[in-house]
């Protein structure tokens, strides 16, 4: 939304009418411009949900052509200005290797209040359940043993990782491979 003129038209009306609503915005942090920052400074209460599905190169793969350094810089700027900061995180086959690093990264930002996580089920091939159990289980175990996973902000994520860890369900690995080939072409 930070690049959409329509959002700024609405925010302009709010400012012109001297209103002070609580604003809630979700952003993938790829673009945080000066105009957006000025609006964040105006509102006394703001909830910003950072849509971030990985750490470092994993995020760059999932959100190509994004650059993690830019996303991290923008997330830090937003965290300093917003009154409430959360992360929306999608657990998927493409970030399961990166869970431990992601948990550590989130833990370093003291302003992040909560990680709202979901397990992806579509498109076909993206769920961690498409990965073989003997591959995914050690990765999930590593994340579940992370010293930070017991912090309140990770409650839902921990429940979902535990579910995946205990699951004996395995979907068609070829669906994951075929989808990956399609993604890698683009």
How would you describe each model-predicted region?
Residues 36, 43, 55, 68, ...:
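Phenylalanine-focused residue identity feature
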Residues 4-7, 52, 68-71, 99, ...:
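A structural signal for well-ordered alpha-helical scaffolds and beta->alpha junctions
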């Amino acid at each position: 939304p930070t690049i959409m003129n329509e959002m700024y038209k609405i925010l302009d009306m709010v400012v012109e009418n001297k209103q002070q609503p609580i604003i809630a915005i979700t952003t993938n942090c790829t673009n945080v411009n000066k105009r957006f920052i000025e609006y964040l400074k105006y509102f006394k209460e703001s909830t910003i949900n950072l849509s971030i599905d990985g750490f470092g190169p994993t995020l760059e793969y999932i959100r190509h052509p994004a650059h993690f350094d830019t996303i991290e810089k923008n997330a830090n700027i937003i965290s300093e200005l917003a009154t409430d900061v959360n992360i929306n995180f999608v657990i998927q086959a493409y970030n399961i290797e990166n869970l431990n690093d992601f948990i550590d990264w989130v833990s370093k930002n003291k302003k992040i209040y909560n990680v709202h996580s979901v397990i992806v089920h579509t498109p076909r091939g993206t769920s961690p359940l498409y990965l073989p159990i003997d591959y995914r289980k050690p990765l999930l175990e590593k994340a579940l043993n992370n010293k930070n996973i017991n912090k309140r902000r990770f409650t839902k994520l921990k429940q979902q990782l535990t579910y995946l860890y205990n699951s004996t369900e395995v979907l068609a690995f070829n669906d994951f491979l075929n989808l990956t080939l399609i993604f890698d072409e683009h």
